[in-house]
Amino acid sequence: MNNKRTFFQYVIPSVLSFALSGVYAIVDGFFVGNSIGDAGLSTINIAYPITAVLQSVGTGIGMGGSVKYSILKAAGNEKKAREFVAGATWLMLLFSAVLTVTVFFTSEKILSALGASGELLTLGNEYIKVIALGAILQVFGTGMVPFMRNYGGSLWAMIAMICGFATNIALDYTFVWVLGRGMYGAALATIIGQGVTMAVALVYCAIKKNLTLKIAPVDTPKTAFQILKIGLAPFGLTLAPNISLVIINRFSVSYGGQEAIATYACISYIICIVYLLLQGVGDGSQPLMSQFYGAGEEKSLKQTKTLAYEFSMVLAVISAILIYLLRGKIGLLFGSSAEVNAGVIKVMPIFLVSVPFDAITRVSTAAFYATEKNVLSYVLTFIEPIIMLVLILMLPPVFGGQIMIWWSTVFAKVITASVSIVLSVRYSAQRNR
């Protein structure tokens, strides 16, 4: 088998799929920002982490189930592999129901905890209640895509994302600009778009005869635990930019006010797409890594990891250069004020410094959960926001306020990447003994 060709057949569609998932937030920000202004842009920025939780739950469960599916299938245990498909499907149904009820009835409290007040709280509540009602569409829309990739359908996973994305754009234009439905319209467009992605994914899985709810009751708890054990890392990895978003927004309220929040909204929309591109490399190569791991093909596993690191670094450098050259257009894209756009031009280069380091961390994390090294993947997933929070608590009061909030995110990524290199080297050394 040509490993390089197979690698890109899996990874390119995955990268594009993850890029489109990041653009979902940008689409809402674009239409709302140009319709309502800085207040609408700031509202999306504050409220989006709630949407991200729903999508991250789907991604985590989907990845957890699909990793086990690929490993067991490669080891020749097809029957057991299908139980993880069923287990993941039941988990997505359960979490969808719980999240719908929880978010809908506590949306105002959650938004307040995220830093919303006054007009932002009113607009955010309007947005999030609709998102909550469509939780099942978001969970399944993101949760079925990993299964499609592990069934060999990376191209169809990308097509499913494109269909959802195109629907989201068309409906955002219709609901927000033509009908003037503001935050409600943006939220409705988002959940319908995810619903289209879910529908395409379910049809594909049904055609492949890999859509099942059949699992022995006695095996259900153990299967669910194994799915969640693996899925915790991809859940956290997908959510990590939004954890950073919450932390930065909370402290920016004190140091930079609404202008700083709006500035970071513009930056985060763009930089998160880059982070998702890099995660697309890791998660796109995951089916191959899991298959080689399950089949005991160490050489092919190592080659796949090397390709993933190299390709993610190329993407990181190219993305950083392009964004730097176009940074003056970013604030204008979202209808921000001149002051906010000036802030984006000034601050964006700081965040671009972190991109190559994030490439290392995301591929390392994906490699660990693809090969069932769950503890190591947890360390890389959750150490970054902890380090960032500590740095934000320490540095801004002493070394310049808001500017050190920005730099704290970079320092956290550099430290996390360093840890990932150490863990990867040690893990490789252990396997080679």
Model-derived regions, located:
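Small-residue-rich hydrophobic transmembrane alpha-helices
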Residues: 41-101, 138-157, 263-321, 325, ...
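N-terminal transmembrane alpha-helices
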Residues: 2-36, 49-64, 68, 93-100, ...
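Transmembrane helical elements of multi-pass membrane transporters/channels
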Residues: 9-28, 130, 141, 164, ...
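Short runs within selected transmembrane alpha-helices of multi-pass transporters and secretion channels
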Residues: 62, 131-149, 157-168, 186-201, ...
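Helix-terminus/linker motif at the lipid-water interface of multi-pass membrane proteins
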Residues: 23-42, 111-118, 174-181, 242-273, ...
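Alpha-helical transmembrane segments and their lipid-water interface positions
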Residues: 17, 21, 25-32, 55-62, ...
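Short alpha-helical transmembrane segments in multi-pass integral membrane proteins
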Residues: 1-14, 69-136, 178-232, 289-354, ...
